[in-house]
Amino acid sequence: MADQANQPTVLHKLGGQFHLSSSFSEGVRARNICPSFSPYERRFATRNYMTQSLWGPSMSVSGGINVPVMPTPLFANAPAEKGGKNFMIDFMMGGVSAAVSKTAAAPIERVKLLIQNQDEMIKSGRLSEPYKGIADCFKRTIKDEGFSSLWRGNTANVIRYFPTQALNFAFKDYFKRLFNFKKDRDGYWKWFAGNLASGGAAGASSLFFVYSLDYARTRLANDAKAAKGGGDRQFNGLVDVYRKTLKSDGIAGLYRGFNISCVGIIVYRGLYFGLYDSIKPVVLTGSLQDNFFASFALGWLITNGAGLASYPIDTVRRRMMMTSGEAVKYKSSLDAFQQILKKEGPKSLFKGAGANILRAIAGAGVLSGYDQLQILFFGKKYGSGGA
């Protein structure tokens, strides 16, 4: 039972789960925005807890709050205080946890992706008319494709956990040491710039290796039965996505949208820390300074604010992914952004954001329940899946 003190609480996980976006896997998925207590800090620095999203794990900032940042898969070995055997147990149990949470949240995740990318599907003739909302998307998907289709693309999302976690441990601390600036020693702006640089470099390094899985997951999830052509699907599975994309577009097809994804990492981090450092000194004063729930609420609001503000980047990158294999493609991420704004309006950039919040809540609930089951059956908590 002593090991339980080293594991994040339900509130830590719930706080992080509200983060908008992905994984870029995401993933997502190890985002902790609640107040941090010292027993957790080392564990949080080396493990992801949230499901899926582009930008993710956490780091400790002033005020004692562990805030979600980019998945920073930084160069290093497994934690020194844990033996190789215990590390592997935690790693595998984390994989089980990731599989459980991602699978539970998969239906709402697919609905989010369908709503987000529906305009590209309409262009290619794979969707007859726009979805009217989350409920309508659920209803039509089940009616046209069956209940089990809500989990389409989930396999790639679950598989992505393992290389992402391996990269987290392989990359640990390398970029941290490279940009080792302290706020109190080097000044705020130098620390802020170093934070963005290290997070961006680490995030891009990790993303480079797992991006094709996120691409495949996106294509499978958006592979609704064609409105024209007798209800045929475009892809027959994960391997088929790779095979057809490589045949039509080459390696570039698997990495369409990668550059804007890296930009998204930096934008999210910049928004988060900029908002946090600006709002915290104003809001968390007096009796609220050390208040757990006030800190939790602030972290939740800032996480959602930064996530919502950076959500258009996620939309642009996924819309670019959807053009691989198509005759007409966006010339660049800027071209995609301009065309979407011109033809569909700014609202289109935020399609699926509501479903994304629901997905995060669902994933948090499952992770919390899974931890309790581990205590019940094993007497302790092992790793929790994220990324």
Curated annotation (Swiss-Prot):
SUPFAM superfamilies: Mitochondrial carrier. The keyword Metal-binding does not apply. Residues 317-322 are annotated as: Important for transport activity. Solcar repeats lie at residues 85-178, 190-282, 290-376. Signal peptide: none annotated. GO terms for cellular component: mitochondrial inner membrane. A motif (Nucleotide carrier signature motif) lies at residues 317-322. It is a multi-pass membrane protein. ADP:ATP antiporter that mediates import of ADP into the mitochondrial matrix for ATP synthesis, and export of ATP out to fuel the cell. Cycles between the cytoplasmic-open state (c-state) and the matrix-open state (m-state): operates by the alternating access mechanism with a single substrate-binding site intermittently exposed to either the cytosolic (c-state) or matrix (m-state) side of the inner mitochondrial membrane. The transmembrane helices are not perpendicular to the plane of the membrane, but cross the membrane at an angle. At least 2 of the odd-numbered transmembrane helices exhibit a sharp kink, due to the presence of a conserved proline residue. This is ADP,ATP carrier protein 2, mitochondrial. The gene is ANT2.
